[in-house]
Amino acid sequence: MSSQQNQNRQGEQQEQGYMEAAKEKVVNAWESTKETLSSTAQAAAEKTAEFRDSAGETIRDLTGQAQEKGQEFKERAGEKAEETKQRAGEKMDETKQRAGEMRENAGQKMEEYKQQGKGKAEELRDTAAEKLHQAGEKVKGRD
């Protein structure tokens, strides 16, 4: 296999590696985001359930003020969940942007490798032509 083909293959493999790494980061970020959302929702549900369990009988006996406090708690939990969801969305946007940048960088690297490969091929061609010319001159000199 020629050096040019090796360089091209290495460039393609490196670009593939960049793309795989970018893909893996996006997937990992998305999984992390889903886990964050899930755990936040679960925590809010557990807190709400704990509140209901511990205050079940008391709530039935309490006045409207106790019911108002429970409603405030639910609203705060909803606000917190919404804030967390918004932050997770922002993080996902940042991750997508970073992945795009990585993809662009990989493309630029691939283009650099292609240009380097073309330059090397031209250099080898010129060297081979020069050596062939020199060999021809030597043969003519022997005649």
Swiss-Prot record:
| Low complexity bias: start-end ranges | 1-17
* Single Gene Ontology MF annotation: identical protein binding
Identify the domain of life: Eukaryota
Cite the residue spans of the region called 4 X 11 AA approximate repeats.
Answer: 47-101
Q: Name one GO biological process term.
A: response to desiccation
Q: Give the sequence repeat ranges.
A: 47-57, 69-79, 80-90, 91-101
What are the Basic and acidic residues biased-composition ranges?
Answer: 47-60, 69-143
Per the entry, what induces it? Up-regulated in response to desiccation stress.
The family annotation for this protein states:
Belongs to the LEA type 4 family.
Function, as annotated:
May be involved in defense against water stress.
Xref: PANTHER family: DAUER UP-REGULATED-RELATED, LATE EMBRYOGENESIS ABUNDANT PROTEIN (LEA) FAMILY PROTEIN
What name appears for this protein in its UniProt entry? Late embryogenesis abundant protein 1
Organism, as annotated: Aphelenchoides avenae (Mycophagous nematode worm)
